């Protein structure tokens, strides 16, 4: 299949090939043509049209048979893609079987064709996204377990706080992925529904056969028949867009963390290296986080597109002017961006390059200050909370002012040495002994992932 796109320079970077195929022009046409073929089979099943008309119609429902450029030019006059496509479909069928042509598109309207065609595309997109989320979850689970006990500086407000583990940080990314999978599972039955209402949503053109045809069509396309047509009730699509927005944001968080850890001043975690990857056109030494950039870019762009979907919700009466049209490129673009971000997230996470020694060095950049809380907690049990906190605060200030390690300052402080032995101080100022429940959080996140996958 030849993909038609105006963004060939960027698509390989921002979009997964598999998703680009779903939403290329041929993919859109095939979704609509699948609706028309399914409609013919459904109407023949209930006896509304002759069975002999089905084969000629179905045989003409192949996207490769149509001139996309000609259809695109016609849309500017027709106002939607279904009108010129149905005309071209009828013309092609008539050239082979004039009798069958009269049964094309019977009882349907343009929006039925386009919305159901879109849902069929979204079904394919949903499978791709779910598959990538599972794969990403598997990778993150493995990495979280691998680095479950690897200490690093926790950072709050972009400053060193207390020690955490790299595994705990990765487990946080994993938890967001797991929740996104759960949301997609929950919305799937609401999203994958038939659109079939005819001109104004009543299916009046089909008379008493309307509901039997709708039921048969839903069965043909393996979609759910909703309680009624949803021409101007767009919450299903907006819900899907919203969940994709959450996925994009979660991936952006992952990308932001990795990019910050790749900074020269941190240099703790890196994207996988490859020839020509992350270089500069002028600076030979550069190793840029090009994968993380895609995640952050998607997290920046997708919310605006989701906002467009929300803005398009108050559609007029039974069929909308302009608001429906605003969805056409928006939702596919959201899918494309999320797919590209997921693809990059998997590649980056699989090949993470970690420098535990650098993490250890960075933990000691503040010369023990990141463990001040650990000492304060123990002293509070012996001196009282306020006294201990004030004492540690003064010791920390002295350590900074004098350029000394907190361990040395504390050892010189009579109130501290009276309560804590040298051995106790050494243990309290060892990051490996102040990781709290970090390992537990890793175990819980990994367990949750695999329970959702089973």
Place the predicted regions along the sequence by residue.
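A helix-coil-helix interface module used to build multimeric assemblies
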Residues: 2-204, 209-214, 277-280, 290-294, ...
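Short beta-alpha connecting loops at secondary-structure transitions
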Residues: 20-24, 70-72, 277-294, 316-333, ...
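Amphipathic alpha-helices that form helix-helix packing interfaces
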Residues: 39-42, 64, 129, 133-136, ...
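A glycine-biased, small/acidic residue-tolerant capping/turn segment at secondary-structure junctions
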Residues: 51-54, 266-273, 343-362, 389, ...
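Glycine-rich cofactor-pocket loops
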Residues: 145-167, 269-279, 285-286, 317-326, ...
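A short, charged helix-loop
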Residues: 212-231
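A conserved active-site cap/scaffold subdomain adjacent to cofactor or substrate pockets
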Residues: 233-268, 276-335
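Long, amphipathic alpha-helical stalk/connector segments used for oligomerization, subunit docking
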Residues: 301-385, 391
